[in-house]
Design a protein with these regions (language model features):
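Conserved acidic catalytic loop of the alpha/beta-hydrolase fold
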Residues: 105-123
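Conserved loop-alpha-helix segment in the C-terminal half of the alpha/beta-hydrolase fold
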Residues: 286-328
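Catalytic active-site module of serine/aspartate enzymes centered on a nucleophile-bearing elbow/loop
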Residues: 323-361
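A catalytic-pocket lid/entrance helix-loop region that shapes and gates access to the active site
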Residues: 148-206
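N-terminal cap/lid segment of alpha/beta-hydrolase-fold proteins
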Residues: 15-40
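Conserved HGGG/HGGXW glycine-rich cap/lid loop of the alpha/beta-hydrolase fold
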Residues: 39-96
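Conserved hydrolase catalytic core segment
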Residues: 121-167
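Alpha/beta-hydrolase
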Residues: 186-299, 307
Length: 361
């Protein structure tokens, strides 16, 4: 599964560069805010040239991450589809100043501008992590423009810290304190597991002594760097191991884990999470999902911290008219890092069902 040699030859002849082995066409979308300020949005189109039904807009997570960590996820299918990725407002290649210009409404309307610039009547959205909340918001604001949704590592349609999300009344009306406690216990187990993974890898890499345990409590990289006299390179390595241990089930591919650090702008997360409109809108996305008649495909790992098990998504999809859940065993939040073949197969099915297009088209 992957890009054909003939396709690479064709792209090389056309002069398009490649990134992560995938042909890419980069451009900037220029928009003007209500106050007259200009924003240049970085856009990167990966894969084939535009053809009817082959375009998928991909929404990265964060809030405040950027697009490139998702390139390995779409690479096996870039011989069939045109994936349009972009850095959302405030993210790495789409800077805005001040952060006050970042809002949930602005992020949704930037996506609508992108749809218009691409000349598409309807769009298929593939979202990862908090990108799912952007997909939900777009569906709420522009339901007539959505052809289908592919929700990867899908954050549930609820605000953070909401102890009684709107959807519970529909999918789990008898959700009780014991259920909340059980969910909290699953998260505690997950935390112990990723810390164990971190320790095993860090010991193997010589960053920590062989007898290391969390006897001091789990310490930050700053504390560990001081305790074990790490160099900046050591500390960066430890951070990447931690990032991988949290986002994958195995942690084995930590050297290939993309994103984080300078690729993440926490100001974006702060701006969106503190935006009153976001809090209001996120309470209204569940009704929008229930009313949507297009295909919704949810792909999640069994060890994804956004919904461990999963617990909530098996119930949620029963209330969305044309929804289907694919659960991938032994995979975390970055599913393609743990189980690349299984993820590629699930994504191919989801794309065929949401776009109506297959490799033979």
């Amino acid at each position: 599964m992957g890009l054909s040699f003939a396709m690479f030859e064709a792209r090389a002849a056309s002069g398009w560069p490649t990134e992560e082995g995938v042909p890419v066409r980069q451009w900037y979308m220029r928009t003007t805010d209500a106050d007259g300020a200009k924003v240049q949005h970085y856009i990167a189109e990966y894969g084939t040239e535009a053809k009817p039904g082959n375009t998928v807009i991909v929404l990265h997570g964060g809030w405040g991450a950027e697009h490139s960590y998702l390139v390995p996820a779409i690479r096996p299918l870039a011989d069939t589809y045109r994936f349009v990725l972009y850095d959302q407002r405030g993210s790495l290649r789409t800077p805005v100043n001040p952060p006050a210009k970042i809002s949930y409404t602005a992020l949704v309307e930037d996506l609508e501008q992108l749809r218009q610039r691409l000349g598409l009547e309807k769009i298929t959205l593939m979202a990862h992590s908090m990108g799912n909340h952007l997909a939900y918001g777009y569906l709420r604001a522009h339901p007539e423009r959505v052809a289908g949704l592919i929700l990867v590592g899908a954050v549930t349609p609820a605000a953070f810290g909401d102890e009684r999300p709107t959807f519970l009344d529909d999918v789990w009306p008898d959700f009780a304190e014991t259920d909340a406690v059980a969910n909290a216990e699953r998260l505690k187990t997950f935390e112990r597991d990723w810390q164990r993974r971190f320790g095993q890898i860090a010991v193997a890499e010589g960053l920590l002594p062989a007898d290391w345990t969390t006897r001091h409590g789990f310490e930050s990289d700053r504390e560990l760097a001081r305790r074990y006299s790490w160099t900046d390179r050591d500390r960066t390595m430890a951070w990447r191991i931690t990032f991988t241990a949290v986002n994958t089930y195995s942690g084995r591919n930590w050297r290939h884990m993309l994103g984080g650090m300078v690729y993440y702008n926490e100001d974006v997360a702060g701006a969106v999470l503190n935006d009153p409109e976001y809090g209001k809108a996120i309470k209204e996305v569940w009704p929008a999902l229930k009313a949507f008649r297009g295909p919704v495909r949810v792909i999640i790992g069994t060890h994804d911290y956004v919904d461990l098990g999963p617990t909530f998504w098996p119930k949620l999809v029963t209330k969305i008219p044309n929804a289907r859940l694919e659960t991938i065993p032994n995979a975390g939040h970055s599913i393609w890092m743990d189980e690349p073949a299984a993820f590629a197969q699930s994504l191919r099915r989801a794309l065929e069902e949401t776009t109506g297009r297959s490799k033979s088209n």
